[in-house]
A protein has these predicted regions:
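Detector for methionine-enriched segments
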Residues: 1, 35-38, 73
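Short intrinsically disordered terminal tails
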Residues: 1-2, 77-80
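Short, isolated positions in well-ordered beta-strands
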Residues: 12-14, 71
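Acidic, low-complexity, intrinsically disordered interaction modules
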Residues: 14-66
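Charged low-complexity stretches with an acidic bias
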Residues: 69-77
Length: 80
């Protein structure tokens, strides 16, 4: 199940990339395409995401819930 999260001060959607099933952070606003490690993944001009595999452990630890609480990413990924 997708989850709305905060990463690097931006609201993104934690999900799995539709083509490969890889976990990623999907944009919620077209202005987010300039974020570090954001990649164009095809389709309409708004299909961009950050693949979690491209983030360091420190960067992954910065992904929080909307209320700022740290997430257990292993558990979150299991539930996706």
């Amino acid at each position: 199940m997708d989850q709305t999260v905060i990463y690097n001060g931006q609201i993104l959607t934690l999900t799995r990339f539709w083509a490969t099933g890889e976990p990623c952070l999907w944009i919620t606003d077209p202005e987010q395409i300039g974020m570090p490690k954001m990649e164009f993944v095809g389709g309409p001009p708004d299909e961009y995401c950050i693949f979690l595999k491209n983030l360091t452990e420190t960067e992954v630890a910065q992904i929080t819930s909307l209320d700022g609480a740290p997430l257990d990413m292993k558990e979150e990924l299991r539930q996706l």
